[in-house]
From Swiss-Prot:
InterPro entries: bHLH_AtIBH1-like, HLH_DNA-bd_sf, IBH1-like. Plants over-expressing IBL1 are dwarf with round-shaped, dark-green leaves and short petioles. It is found in: Nucleus. One of its GO terms (biological process) is brassinosteroid mediated signaling pathway. Its main location: nucleus. Residues 110-160 form the bHLH domain. One of its GO terms (molecular function) is DNA-binding transcription factor activity. It comes from the Eukaryota. This is Transcription factor IBH1-like 1.
Amino acid sequence: MQPTSSMNEEFLKKWQMGLQIFRPSIDNTSVHERKKAIKLSADVAMASLRKGTTCWSRALIEKTATEDNFLVRQMLSGIKAETLINKKLPKKTVCHRKIVRRSKKILRRKSKSASEEAAAKAKRLVKRRTQGLRNVVPGGELMSNDVLLLQETLDYIVSLQTQVNVMRSIVDAAEAEIER
């Protein structure tokens, strides 16, 4: 799924608003601080496109709200910023390591046929790749449902593609201006 031009336009508007909010504080800062401000405003703009309807957008809003609460409140002013910032994400459930180790030992003791071994390898591979997705998508580590994780990942990819398209068009426009 490709991002629509209206998504690109809305992202650009929200990103510009975030950069304008940061503008007074950016002028006398280091390159690292400017980079951080650009990334922070882009993340908030991307999350505000989804208006907190997805887990990854709420996770980004929560993360950026701790870094720069003023920016988040300004950029989310039209979509109930207080409820999104204060909305708690579900807590991750944690297993006891001893129990997990004990159950793994019991499983190893049982003999497996070749097909069972292949199925177990495939399960481990899927689990490893799913964990990789959980680490990439904001808030992914809190999602226990794999189908929801895939839906959120696809939505996050579309939003990242929107961000890349807008940034690429800005760079192209700047390069065209320099060539003149």
